[in-house]
Every structure is written in structure tokens, then in C-alpha cells.
């Protein structure tokens, strides 16, 4: 279940309160437990996956979550599978660990592992959101954010796209608030 770290050090774990904090940004978070993970538990704990296994996971997931694609106009999706042995892991981390925006929305449903997203709120304050298994996150286009793996370096999520080129980061130059990283 998601948790939100506010700039003043407050940690919020109530999903309704997290949603309220993120609402001014248009960021949407919801926790869904469709039960699909019981259909492929061995694949969720496995680091490397074949293309066939990835397609199997996405197909099973989409059979339950087709409404997400229809409601939001997502054109396609894929499975993001990051683990300590992932090729180009450090490049992936460096690409998204700086504040950026996208011209298209960023949306994902977490299957396993966890990731941290940082946001700049309209008042200039910064918050960090930890998403975990069964959390669905939708970030509208133009919202300033960054994301990073946690220390486990392990994350599996179905990513949803509205543009053929996916999520291209446009860096903003905003500095991460060090007080959130203590």
C-alpha cells in the first residue's frame, strides 16, 4: 500500500489522505487487488523474464484491467521488469531520477516491488510517494516529478501509454529537496 512523505517529515499512509494531497496535481492513485497475481506468483519473484512470460503477465492483467485502458485512452501497454541484473540499470536510474515532465500521461500498475515518485506541488513544496504491489498510479502530462527504485532494485509494473513514443522525459532543472532524503 502506498505511503506519502511530506516536506515537513509527516508520513501519510491513509490512501484517501494521500489522494487528497496529490489532487492539486491531478495525480490519481488507487489500490486494486484483482487477484491476478495468484495466477503467476512464480513469475513475480523471478528476476529475468522471457518475452513470452512478459506477454503472459500483461495478457492476464489486461483481461481484468481493460477498463483502465478504455477510461484513460491508453493505446498500448508493456511490462517494466527491473532487477539488480537488468542491463543498463544505472542508465535507467539516472534517466528518471531528475525532475522532469512528459507530454503524455504516465500510468502504471505495480505487480511486485516498489518505486518512489517525487512531486513538486503547486506551492513549491515537494513530496515523495512510495508505490507498492497493487497500486495504480496515473500522473497527468506536464506534472513535474521524478522516480527511482528503492534499495531492492526490484520492480515489476504494467505501464500504460497514450503515445507511440512512450514517456520521453523533459528535464526541468528543479533540485530534489534534500530534507526528504534523510
Swiss-Prot record:
It is an enzyme of class 1 (oxidoreductase). Its cofactor is Fe(2+); Ni(2+). Ni(2+) binds at residues 100, 102, 106, 145. Binds 1 Fe(2+) cation per monomer. Fe(2+) binds at residues 100, 102, 106, 145. GO terms for biological process: L-methionine salvage from methylthioadenosine; L-methionine salvage from S-adenosylmethionine. InterPro entries: ARD (IPR004313), ARD_bac (IPR023956), RmlC-like_jellyroll (IPR014710), RmlC_Cupin_sf (IPR011051). GO terms for molecular function: acireductone dioxygenase (Ni2+-requiring) activity; acireductone dioxygenase [iron(II)-requiring] activity; iron ion binding; nickel cation binding. It comes from the Bacteria. It catalyses: 1,2-dihydroxy-5-(methylsulfanyl)pent-1-en-3-one + O2 = 3-(methylsulfanyl)propanoate + CO + formate + 2 H(+); 1,2-dihydroxy-5-(methylsulfanyl)pent-1-en-3-one + O2 = 4-methylsulfanyl-2-oxobutanoate + formate + 2 H(+). Pfam families: ARD. Pathway: Amino-acid biosynthesis; L-methionine biosynthesis via salvage pathway; L-methionine from S-methyl-5-thio-alpha-D-ribose 1-phosphate: step 5/6. Keywords: Amino-acid biosynthesis, Dioxygenase, Iron, Metal-binding, Methionine biosynthesis, Nickel, Oxidoreductase. Gene3D superfamilies: Jelly Rolls (2.60.120.10). Its EC number is 1.13.11.54, 1.13.11.53. Disulfide bonds: none annotated. Monomer. Catalyzes 2 different reactions between oxygen and the acireductone 1,2-dihydroxy-3-keto-5-methylthiopentene (DHK-MTPene) depending upon the metal bound in the active site. Fe-containing acireductone dioxygenase (Fe-ARD) produces formate and 2-keto-4-methylthiobutyrate (KMTB), the alpha-ketoacid precursor of methionine in the methionine recycle pathway. Ni-containing acireductone dioxygenase (Ni-ARD) produces methylthiopropionate, carbon monoxide and formate, and does not lie on the methionine recycle pathway. Belongs to the acireductone dioxygenase (ARD) family. This is Acireductone dioxygenase. The gene is mtnD.
